[in-house]
Amino acid sequence: MAMEGPILCRAVMQAKLPVTMISNSLTKSGQLGTAFLGCVCKYRNITRLISPIYQPAQKNFATVCGSFSSSSDGNGYMAGNFSESDEDYVNSTVLEAVEVRSGAEGYVIKMRDGKNLRCVHNNSQGRNIPESAPQPAIVLRIEDGSETLLPIIVLEMPSVLLMAAIRNVHIARPTIYQVVKEMIDKMGYEVKLVRINKRIQEAYCAELFLTKVGDHTESITFDLRPSDAINIAVRCKVPIQVHRSLAYSDGIRSVEPARMAIAAGMSDGLLFTELDRPDGQPCVEAQEFGLIRNMLIAAVEERYKDAATWRDKLMLLRSKRKNWA
């Protein structure tokens, strides 16, 4: 059953603030642009596009075309419903990775502790790897026993905020992800799970699933960037699932088991490896990441003098590294 026709609604009075100013306040520092403006929201079977474009009204009434269709496809499936145990998806966890560099020999993942993990495609028919400089990334480990990793290139700010959430770093001012989490709670919904569902060319897509508190048959689905969806999932402590076809076609695996399995000592029958404990040497990469994190957090909290101080320390460290090289 479907109904279509014009709907009369009272025109909204022109706001004093232009939309560009509102958008800029949500996309501070240019890092979270179009994070939620313009996203597609699917409420059961009603699909609507939330447009950030504001049109000032010239009349008291305006005509809007709307549509409504049946909530069943004939098989009892309610549009917007989902199954957390869908066999097409597999659970994953977030690794504490900082950046990913790719080249002809594969991938190199830099971990938060400064260690480098060299990887290659999980299958011989994987995508061709274009050479690229180190880029901020979120790395997911597929929890199916295969030790497959899925690197997702993101902007630097979402990567830093994700590491802050994983390490429980306190940020004085609320981030956009904390605001969204509180908005969802106020609306009477809860985050159920996040899914990385497809890739369009080189860009991954994600879905955020919400359910009504007390009535899980009522759900809403949002299409988001993976960096935003994963940040929300970590803060809400919900599963992050990856489509199995993506894990198979784009997944990578470590090819340096020798470095990871070198015995560094035995204690009470436990084998400690080089990767499991520090070697006592200063790690310049970890120090550099700490300075970058402190600088970005200070900028988010609008402590610009502190951010400038961290920036100067970072430039000094990098200049020393260049001289050493």
Curated annotation (Swiss-Prot):
<dbReference type="Pfam" id="PF02577">
    <property type="entry name" value="BFN_dom"/>
</dbReference>
<dbReference type="GO" id="GO:0005634">
    <property type="term" value="C:nucleus"/>
</dbReference>
<dbReference type="GO" id="GO:0004518">
    <property type="term" value="F:nuclease activity"/>
</dbReference>
<comment type="similarity">
    <text>Belongs to the bifunctional nuclease family.</text>
</comment>
<dbReference type="GO" id="GO:0030891">
    <property type="term" value="C:VCB complex"/>
</dbReference>
<protein>
    <recommendedName>
        <fullName>Bifunctional nuclease 2</fullName>
        <ecNumber>3.1.-.-</ecNumber>
    </recommendedName>
</protein>
<keyword id="KW-0540">Nuclease</keyword>
<feature type="domain" description="BFN">
    <location>
        <begin position="119"/>
        <end position="254"/>
    </location>
</feature>
<comment type="function">
    <text>Bifunctional nuclease with both RNase and DNase activities. Involved in basal defense response. Participates in abscisic acid-derived callose deposition following infection by a necrotrophic pathogen.</text>
</comment>
<keyword id="KW-0539">Nucleus</keyword>
<dbReference type="InterPro" id="IPR003729">
    <property type="entry name" value="Bi_nuclease_dom"/>
</dbReference>
<dbReference type="GO" id="GO:0016567">
    <property type="term" value="P:protein ubiquitination"/>
</dbReference>
<dbReference type="InterPro" id="IPR036104">
    <property type="entry name" value="BFN_sf"/>
</dbReference>
<feature type="domain" description="UVR">
    <location>
        <begin position="285"/>
        <end position="320"/>
    </location>
</feature>
<keyword id="KW-0378">Hydrolase</keyword>
